[in-house]
Amino acid sequence: MQKKIIVLALISAFAAPAAFADTEKAELEKLRAMVQELDQKIRTLEHKLESKTAAPAQANANANTNTNTAASAPATTASGITFYGRVNADFESVKNDKVSAVTTAKSVNRVQSNASRFGLKGSEGLGDDLAAIWQLEIQVDPANGGGTPFNGTRNSNVGLKGGFGTVFVGTWDTPYKLAHNKLELFDNASIFSATNLIGRTGANNAANTLVTAVNYNTRQSSVLQYWSPNLSGFQGMIAYSPDSGQTTTQNKSKLSLSGTYENDMLYGALAYENRPDQTTAAVDDHATRLVGAYKFGGGLIGMAYERLSVGTAAATTESQSNLELAGNYKLGNSNLGAFYVKNGNLGARANTGADMYTLRYGYNFSKHTELYGAYTRLSNDASANYSTLTATAIGTVGAASTNGSTQTGLGIGMIYLF
């Protein structure tokens, strides 16, 4: 800023004589315009430098989980606040061959928003390699014409980042969930996502109701998280969410942690989550996940294996194993992706598993815009009731799927990043 004042003073001094020729006046105006332009560039570079030195490690979690979509640089204001967002909507034809209400259509066409969002984030350097960080992100629904377009809090936090790592409080994806993101082809809120099976247990539908279905792909509210610095590719994360309604007999707090390693060719993650007293006091729900991926050129192939255990109303524990194979490849502007997930039986109860696969093709028109198409199929065993269609059958309230259903979906949509 001092340099700007000096330059303007020099220009003014030379401009003191009253009778300038027209050409000299024009030259003076050009110089003043150049100074203003240079000053704006200096401000922009200063904010970029501050963002690089003080940006939170949360950038990895903010990244689009669809690894096929081209990256887009978010907009940064002069005050250092970054605006960013994603609009993802598609036209779908979905089918469920078994629904619980005879008046419910087994197939429908619909328009869906898939975790579209808008966010603000920023940081402030506090000196001594310390920075304050914050983020506010909400989910929006451009397909919802009958209600509010704003329908939920996404990853939002406030905290500190420094040489010690990153610590924050707020609402955020658990380390267990984040460990899987490297393989995810879609946002979790989509009929095409692998998280309709991976990370989930089935309810025990084999002649009793001791077990409630559990989902470990969670964005945890009221959470305290710590992320270690990245040490030559290694990073640890830990999250703790207290139980504000704790009683003398039950404490439903949640603990989630992970260790990851990543370089130009490999990605590996080991994650664990524990949820005590969820169904019955003194019985824990817990999950362990192992993820590995190999990166090559424009592609990635990977696998996830997990062991999930849930408490029952009889104060026992039942477990199941899930497996996922996934891959994606970028060829020019085209993006190809596919995955297969197999969920095992719950405990010793037969026919409580399911499998699912999805095929995806996308085309990047620019770094902001992708057009995509996808097909998915989920097949339940005779006593299982997993669903890509949430708790209701293809959007019809009150008409849930029944055991043993097969669900399919075909869609074409567009993603715009800003």
For the regions a protein language model found, what residue spans apply to each?
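Structural signature of outer-membrane beta-barrel channels/translocons
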Residues: 121-125, 161-163, 227-232, 260-264, ...
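Detector for outer-membrane/organellar transmembrane beta-barrel domains
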Residues: 250, 255-364, 376-377
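Extracellular loop and loop/strand-boundary signature of outer-membrane beta-barrel proteins
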Residues: 101-107, 211, 311-314, 344-348, ...
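Outer membrane beta-barrel
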Residues: 74-95, 105-245, 251-253, 260-267, ...
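N-terminal periplasmic/intermembrane-space "pro-region" immediately following the signal or transit peptide
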Residues: 3-86
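Outer-membrane beta-barrel "beta-signal"
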Residues: 404-418
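Outer-membrane beta-barrel and related beta-rich outer-membrane complex signature
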Residues: 97-99, 146, 179-187, 315, ...
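Transmembrane beta-strands of outer-membrane beta-barrel proteins
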Residues: 81-89, 128, 132-136, 167, ...
